[in-house]
Amino acid sequence: MRIIGFRATLAVALGAMACSQQVDSTDVRTSGVYADMSVYASGNGKSEVQVDLRVGGSSSNTHLEIKGADKLTATVGTVTKALSKSGNIYVTTFDGDAADTQFILAFTRGPDDTSAPNSSVTLPEPFAISGIAQTVSRQVGFTATWQAGTKGEPMTWVLRGDCLVAQAGSISDAGQTVIPAGKPVAVLGQEQATCNASFCLERDRSGILDPAFGEGGVISAAQSRCAAFLSAP
């Protein structure tokens, strides 16, 4: 899935390396579909819905192409939008990224199959990252702070840069984390380089998937934020 959340960036990279194929949705029963549904908010006042329907489970590279009477829609409040195709997935965007905004995702089928009209998820609380200087020495490290959430939801971090070895991990939603001296590691041969870098955090929340998807799946929403800086020796 494409970037808003940085997990999506990794998925795009992995998808590019793997062979994929598509099958018409009208050739597959809902009971044989695995659903991967996400909502991402990156702090720009919008939320992007991404849906990837696959045949063969979570590790499959066979994606459904919506055909015939089948359709994918997303609803927020009184606004319903159809998802449009983007590569192997389907996407749409809504204005707004407030905490607890509910998204209802529907896979509506033709008369010969079972619809899955009620997968739902709400956005976690938004936040902002602070505490990172404009230039950070790799021999010093930094402390990143943010507004801790009220629900103890899982968070992940990613540190990356033009001259850095990319790193990622999971942390508690405590409002602060330390990237110690020496943890930002330069790519071999670029130990003395200064480069553009970013530290990103993502707060995640799971939703409820419509049980009609016989192969199961996941539905989640994330608030993702990044802080840019210069990484120096």
Predicted regions and their residues:
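Short beta-strand elements
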Residues: 118-127, 209-233
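Short helix-loop boundary/capping segments
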Residues: 128-181
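Surface-exposed loop/turn and intrinsically disordered segments
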Residues: 84-142
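Bacterial N-terminal signal peptides that target proteins for export
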Residues: 1-9
